[in-house]
Amino acid sequence: MARMSGLLAGLPTEVGGATINRLCGSGLEALSQASRAIRLGEAHISIAGGVESMSRAPFVMAKADKAYSRNVSVFDSTIGARFP
């Protein structure tokens, strides 16, 4: 999300981007990391923000075991569940 946003905004390809997935806390974590990088001299300028993308996609599917597999497991991601 961050990398694509930067590229679409016209930032050069040499500028990096990091996507943080902490559900509701993603935007706050992004601001915290940007602030830390500036305070420590790791960056002069940072762009930080957040997007909400979980409301419409609470269920996710794991990668298939093999190509064309029909054995699909669905997991509830609304509470931050990870794949087993």
Region roles according to the model:
Residues A2-M4:
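Helix-rich "cap/lid" substructures immediately adjacent to catalytic or cofactor-binding pockets
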Residues G6-P84:
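Acyl-thioester C-C bond-transforming condensing/cleaving domain
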